[in-house]
Amino acid sequence: MKGYSSGQLSMPSYGAGTANSEFELITGMNLDHFGAAEYPYKTVLQDTTTESMATVLKNYGYKAHAIHDNSAAFYDRDLVFSQLGFDTFTTKESMNIKKWTENGWAKDQILTGCIMDSLDSTKGQDYVYCISVQGHGDYPTTQIIENPEITVEGIEDEALKNKYTYYVNQVYQMDQFVGKLVKALQQRGEPTILCMYGDHLPSLEIEDEDLTYGNKYQTSYFMWDNIGLKKKDGTIEAYDLGSEVLNKCNIH
């Protein structure tokens, strides 16, 4: 991925709060303009629509799809995604999930087929917002993975070491999912921009001084494409990422 745009995203939360990171990404709104500890999915979006990536792209003929390998009701997404302009919402209730983490979350490998199905469901262009769940907490304090592919060293606290061992092995498998998704998109051949990001760092007692770069309110993102876009790296706010994608599509 070194040849593609990447960088750090400044997120509104640490350790939890996926829905708020998601809200900023989809709407381009800064949560600082909302109430303290407010979740717009639980408040204003219950009975109000708003402009979003989905509504903007639909004005250009796109269909908008949301996908999540967890319950539709999680964070009330089943209620608010229509308010955000999505045409379809595919969740675990309609997925044939056969592989689960040791902690009971769906493994993200199921998502490649779901994304391809959404892209194939129309003859035109599509906007797909996909939320993965494999790396979700809580993280087990006991060793529940037999023969982990990735081992952890340098942590004396056994419970914390077990948490990290579980987490990094999920991330390893999620990375494999990303590779397979990129390969599937390459084979499909349709002009595509794939933007991947982390919604927040995990709740693993992380402090700024533990990090090689950035701070605990920053996550990584990258944008893969098959249309020859110019590489542009940098640190941006989460609510600006959608605009970056639209700019690459020459939509202003």
Where are these regions (language model features)?
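Solvent-exposed soluble domains appended to multi-pass membrane proteins
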Residues: M1-H252
